[in-house]
A protein has these predicted regions:
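Segments that shape or occlude catalytic/ligand-binding pockets
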Residues: 81-252
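Generic hydrophobic secondary-structure signal
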Residues: 2-6, 11-13, 164, 218, ...
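Helix N-cap and loop-to-helix transition residues
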Residues: 74, 192-193, 271
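Preferential activation on post-signal-peptide N-terminal prodomains/segments
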Residues: 1-3, 7-10, 14-151
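Glycine-rich, flexible loop segments associated with nucleotide phosphate handling
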Residues: 67-74, 234-238, 258-266
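A short, surface-exposed beta-strand/turn
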Residues: 28-48, 146-174, 252-284
Length: 284
C-alpha cells in the first residue's frame, strides 16, 4: 500500500524491509523509519543541502531557503502530495513549513570545487531542478513531537520531510515515527515559561562564559525518553525545547583584523513538569 501511494505498483525487487525499482527509486522501512528516494535525490542530495550537517532545521535554514513561489510547481499540490502519504500511513502532523530550493539558492549554496569520496563533482544545477521542501512535525493531540531531541538514535527526534520538484515527488522521509501503545495522565502540572527562563539563567550563572547566550525560541514539545533498551521502547514526555544562540568572538593572528565572529545554535531541554534539564547527548 505504501509503495503504491508513493510511486505506483510496478516494482523490481522486494523483501520485508526494502523495495527497489528498476529506475533507481527505493523504499526502506525499518525500526520506525520510512525512506523513499528517487535516483534524482540520490544523485543531487536535496536533503543534504536542506539539512547540511544539522539533524534538525533552524531559523538559518529559513534564511538559506526562504519560502518563495517556484514557477512550474503548484505549491499547494506539493503540500497535499506529501500530506496524503502521511494520511496513508496514519501519521498526525501539524501545519507544514515550506522551503524553496530555487536554482539561485542551490547555486549559492554549492561549492563546485568540492568533490565526494568517489571524486565526483557536485551536480550542475539548472532552473528545472528547483523544488519545494515540505516539512511537517508529528503531533499527539496537537502537541508537536520534537525534531531536536537530546541524544542520538530515535531520541534525536522525528524528521518528516518531502521534496517535490517539477517531475513530482523526489524524496520522502519519515524518520523516528512512534506508535502509541498506552497514554498516561500527567502526574504534575506543566511549568510556566517564566520558570524555564529562570532555570536557564541559573544554569549559566554557574558557568563562566564570555559570550552572551540568547534564547530565541521556547517550544513545548514531546521528547522521546528511552524506557526499555532491549524492546526499543520510548516514553514521550512533555518538555520545553529552548533554542539558544551564542555569538562567539575569536581573536585573529593579524593585528589589523582584531576579532572575528561566529555563531552557534544549540538546544537546551527541560522536563516540563519537574524543570530538570535533559543532558544533550546523554541519558535522561
Amino acid at each position: 500500500e505504501i509503495s503504491e501511494c508513493l510511486v505506483g505498483s510496478e516494482m523490481c525487487i522486494r523483501d520485508s524491509n526494502y523495495i527497489y525499482w528498476d529506475d533507481g527509486s527505493s523504499i526502506v522501512i525499518q525500526n520506525g523509519n520510512l525512506q523513499y528516494n528517487t535516483k534524482t535525490e540520490l544523485e543531487y542530495s536535496y536533503l543534504g543541502y536542506l539539512y547540511g550537517t544539522m539533524p534538525y532545521l533552524t531559523d538559518e535554514t529559513t534564511e538559506k531557503f526562504p519560502e518563495t513561489e517556484i514557477s512550474g510547481i503548484d505549491k499547494e499540490a506539493a503540500i497535499e502530495q506529501v500530506k496524503s502519504i502521511l494520511d496513508e500511513i496514519g501519521v498526525e502532523v501539524s501545519k507544514p513549513r515550506v522551503y524553496s530550493l530555487t536554482y539561485e539558492k542551490l547555486e549559492e549554496n554549492t561549492d563546485y570545487s568540492q568533490t565526494d569520496p568517489n571524486g565526483n563533482a557536485p551536480h550542475q544545477w539548472t532552473k528545472e531542478d528547483a523544488a519545494y521542501a515540505i516539512v511537517f512535525k508529528g503531533t499527539i493531540d496537537t502537541l508537536p513531537i520534537t525534531e531536536v531531541g537530546y541524544r542520538s538514535g530515535p531520541a534525536a527526534g522525528e524528521r518528516i520531510v518531502g521534496i517535490v520538484g517539477k517531475q513530482g515527488l523526489i524524496a520522502f522521509h519519515a524518520l523516528n515515527i512512534y506508535e502509541l501503545e498506552t497514554e498516561n495522565e500527567l502526574s504534575d502540572e506543566i511549568l510556566t515559561t517564566q520558570t524555564v527562563l529562570e532555570n536557564i539563567q541559573q544554569k549559566f550563572r554557574n558557568i563562566m562564559i564570555t559570550d552572551k547566550v540568547e534564547i530565541e525560541k521556547i517550544n513545548l514539545e514531546y521528547v522521546p525518553v528511552l524506557k526499555n533498551v532491549e524492546k526499543g521502547e520510548y516514553e514521550l514526555k512533555p518538555m520545553f525545547v529552548c533554542m539558544a544562540r551564542q555569538n562567539i568572538e575569536h581573536s585573529t593572528d593579524k593585528e589589523d583584523n582584531g576579532l572575528i565572529g561566529d555563531s552557534s545554535i544549540f538546544p537546551i531541554i527541560f522536563d516540563a513538569q519537574t524543570g530538570m534539564e535533559i543532558q544533550i547527548g546523554g541519558t535522561y
